[in-house]
Amino acid sequence: MRKSLHGSNFVLLGLTLLLVSCLGTAHRTPEPKRVASIQPTQAPTAKTGNNVSPQATSSAQNTPVPTENTHSTQVSPGMTVTSSGLPNFGHIIIIVMENKEASQIVGNPDAPFLNELARDYAQAADYYAISHPSLPNYLALTGGDTFGITSDCHTCFVNADNIANQLAAAGKTWKAYMESMPGPCFVGDKLPDYSVNHDPFMYYDDIRTNPDLCNEVVPFSQFSIDLRADTLPDFVWITPNTCNDMHSCAISIGDSWLKTLVPEILASPAWKDNGVLFITFDEGVTQSGCCSFAAGGKVFTLVISPFGKAGYVSTASYDHYSLLRTIEASWNLPLLEKAGSKSTPLMSEFFAR
């Protein structure tokens, strides 16, 4: 009995020592180190008018974003951005075609080149003209309003600010190239293939009456000279004549005209060096619209830039005021009229990566 108790004491002593050892080891175990980790975050969305587009967060791997820009959009390496989050374009080129609904162009075998561009670059598939007929849309694209004009009047001049005046004030160069226009600053109203209502710049008083500005509205023949000499201005507007813009001639004629012109633009330093080319139509053939102001039909619109998205189709709603807003915002210009409306969305998604 005593021997048994003695053995039991040794067992109890052993268990006690084992317990103390375990507690000591647990007490000495260091806490794991805290390692900072970067967790992927969901970018916030910004709603503007009828368009909800993601605002991408800036990345250290991309071009540095100005510190004052708190709503930046990621763009391709090599491209700087403005306070709006848009690329700071070196050159902006716009070509305006005529009088076709988007459905008349998309998939049309008579427009193979435009459809090829849509596959290779970016298309705004829900983009609308503002009104009917042509002239109000040209004014909307350049002045941010139709200014109460509802016809293709030839002498209904406008005393209003406009993109050309803004560019000149900001020290940027600009030129409007008008096919079949007989000479710079031509104030006549109509020729066989030229119509002034497709030339919005001649409607603005501060351009038409100022030789320094008016002489920047030139015949299209000057474009090839400037392109080959690498002297294109910062802002380029191109209006084809009334046949090549599809107004009076077949879609295939306008498509062929673009097939000759656009590759020359895309091969130029002006486009390759931070450039962007927009191709749109002044109006469609329906009353469809979006974004509070537009009711001029859905029109085929392309965004072509070496820093833009490729093979991209946007279903967000845009209109001519959106395009003007995008141009002005990319160069930190004041927003004209309805281009500054809260219901006018910015076309920044085409350059986000």
List where the protein language model places each region:
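C-terminal motif of bacterial Sec signal peptides marking the signal peptidase cleavage site
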Residues: L19-S21
